Structure formats: structure tokens, C-alpha cells
Curated annotation (Swiss-Prot):
Signal peptide, first to last residue: none
Stated name of the protein: Large ribosomal subunit protein uL1
PROSITE patterns: RIBOSOMAL_L1
An annotated Gene Ontology molecular function: tRNA binding
Entry annotated with the keyword RNA-binding: yes
UniProt keyword list: Repressor, Ribonucleoprotein, Ribosomal protein, RNA-binding, rRNA-binding, Translation regulation, tRNA-binding
Record Gene3D superfamilies: 3.30.190.20, 3.40.50.790
UniProt gene name: rplA
GO cellular component, one term: cytosolic large ribosomal subunit
Domain of life: Bacteria
Function: Binds directly to 23S rRNA. The L1 stalk is quite mobile in the ribosome, and is involved in E site tRNA release.
């Protein structure tokens, strides 16, 4: 317990929790404090000025991170015939139709992203109660219901990150690893923020991005000046 207490004290040292730090400074501070024995994920959390209980204030989309996430993303694809072969050739980890349906329906979910061709959605739709809560349900709005399965698989493995606002008006995502350089993390965060801004719903009034924080898996959140996140 003493070691844990000391670690927490060290992490909190020299941080002003009332300060809004410039993005680059915040990322540097988070990286310096990511001292776990594994490569911690760097995460961003954004509080938005929306109430997702209203349909016209839902925020959902996909961000394409220029430097990837640092994760080995496992991709499952629902497809048949030629499209199934395209998915396999593009690096999909799991490809199937009824067999994949049965596997998921029995509780086997060993993938991070799910893609489907449009003709498969009648089958995939029956898995809504399983895939929906896990944010794995294919959706044309984020490019996971498509005939272009090859590019969808490549995008998923190359840094595509889905986001969806939660009840409290928060969107969050892992946008890299502590082993990434500061500039790469900053570039990824700006790409994520840009996608969130583009996804601003018509029903959103007033200030859209209210608060931003950056953290690592085992670290604490550091407040970021939203203006430095949204600037070019």
C-alpha cells in the first residue's frame, strides 16, 4: 500500500488541477507519469454541450488517427463469396456469415471491430442486443456497413476509432500509447477532436466542447485548454 500511495503522490506532483494546460504540455506530463510496467494507453475525454437523451443531440462518428492507436485491432467481417475473399486478403481476422453469427450468439466475441456488407445486415441485426452494448454493431454512418470491405478492414487496422457520446455528454477514446512521441499523440488527438467537431449535431446549442482531459491507463486526468485541442 505504501508503494501505491507513493506512486500516486509522485504522479500528482507538480500538477495544478485548477490549471488548463496547453495540449502539448498536458501530453508531455501524462507521458512522463506513465511509468507502469506495460505500454500504457493514452486516452482523451471530452465533455460536450449536448444531451444525448434527445435524438437531435446524439454524437457519433469515426476518427482516423494518422499515427494509429498502437493496438493490434482484431476485425471481424460478415460477408459471403467475393467480398469474403476481399476481407481475408485485406487482413481481416475473422470472416464468416451464419457460422460467425452462431459463434457470436453463443458468446464468443474475440474481435474489436465488426464490419458487414449491406446484404448481411438482416442476419447481423439479430445480434443487436449482443453487439450494440459493446459498440460493435456495424453502422453505415461510421463506415462499417459497406461493400468496400477491403478499405474498411485496412482503416480499422490502421487507426480508425469509433466514438459515441455517453449519457453524461462525454466522448472518450484511446488515441495512442505512452511509447509514442509527443507530436504523434498530439496529431492523433487533434484528428480525434476534428472528427468530434464535424459530428456536431444540429440540436447542439451554445458551447460544444466544454472540457477536455488527457490521461494514461494507470495515470490521472490532466485538464487541457480546449482551444489548444481544436486549433490547427
Amino acid at each position: 500500500m505504501r508503494k501505491v500511495a507513493k506512486r500516486i503522490k509522485d504522479i500528482r506532483k507538480d500538477i495544478d488541477f485548477n490549471e488548463l494546460y496547453a495540449l502539448k504540455d498536458a501530453v508531455s506530463m501524462v507521458k512522463e507519469r506513465a511509468v507502469a510496467k506495460f505500454d500504457e494507453t493514452i486516452e482523451i475525454s471530452m465533455n460536450l454541450g449536448v444531451d444525448p437523451r434527445h435524438a437531435d443531440q446524439m454524437v457519433r462518428g469515426v476518427a482516423h488517427l494518422p499515427n494509429g492507436t498502437g493496438r493490434n485491432v482484431r476485425v471481424a467481417v460478415f460477408a459471403r463469396g467475393e467480398k469474403a475473399e476481399e476481407a481475408k486478403a485485406s487482413g481481416a481476422d475473422i470472416v464468416g456469415a451464419e457460422d460467425l453469427f452462431e459463434s457470436i450468439n453463443s458468446g464468443t466475441i474475440d474481435f474489436d471491430r465488426c464490419i458487414a456488407t449491406p446484404d448481411m445486415m438482416l442476419l447481423v441485426g439479430r445480434l443487436g442486443k449482443i453487439l450494440g452494448p459493446r459498440n460493435l454493431m456495424p453502422n453505415p454512418k461510421v463506415g462499417t456497413v459497406t461493400l468496400d470491405v477491403a478499405n474498411a478492414v485496412k482503416a480499422s487496422k490502421g487507426g480508425a476509432v469509433e466514438f459515441r457520446v455517453e449519457k453524461a455528454g462525454i466522448v472518450h477514446a484511446g488515441i495512442g500509447k505512452a511509447s509514442f512521441g509527443v507530436e504523434k499523440i498530439v496529431e492523433n488527438i487533434k484528428a480525434f477532436a476534428s472528427a468530434v467537431i464535424k459530428a456536431r449535431p444540429q440540436g447542439a446549442k451554445g458551447e460544444y466542447i466544454k472540457r477536455v482531459a488527457v490521461s494514461s491507463t494507470m495515470g490521472i486526468g490532466i485538464k487541457v485548454d480546449p482551444a489548444t485541442v481544436c486549433s490547427e
